[in-house]
Amino acid sequence: TVIRKSYDDNITSSDVNARDFFDDRFYLNPTTSHDSLRVMRLENKVFIRLQPWKSDGIISKLDVGLGDKLLNYFAFEPDSYISGGSNKVFNSVYLYAGAQGQYDKYLQWNAKGQYTFLGHEINDFGIEANVSFSAYPFRRHRTSPLTLNAHFETTLKEPDYYQQHMLTNHYRWDNDFGKISTTRLEASVSV
């Protein structure tokens, strides 16, 4: 996947509205902007899927695999004045696993996890789990379930390159953030 974004403008020194829009921040050129960002992501996976029992069993599928993620970022940097624009390339290798199953029409579940053991995003991980319980309490509509859904997710991830570094005509930062931890628990009921 390749994502490109280009931005051009010409703002005169007397254009008060346009200058106020950017809080009068012009880091590279006071009247003209031409900013370009590009991200390329290439991901390869090798996995094996096991179906230990029947397809609608309590454990119906097990997945185990190995993945390789290549990220290529292009952005302007102060060194670009001397050497021209350059790409920043990061590679990471990870293990992932998942499982899913169900019990009749009353229970469905799935879970997956990923751990990066080599490369730029070393020690990143993510765990995600979903469960759905269904009951059929309605006498007149015996096939209409009352369903409780729950979702749990936790991640620890390296910030991406643009969260850490940015130099455009109107925005500039150079940070050294640590890993970002996110935990989410959601539940819903449907009738």
Task: Give the ranges of each region predicted by the language model.
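Exposed, low-structure sequence patches enriched in small/polar residues
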Residues: 1-16, 24-25, 29-191
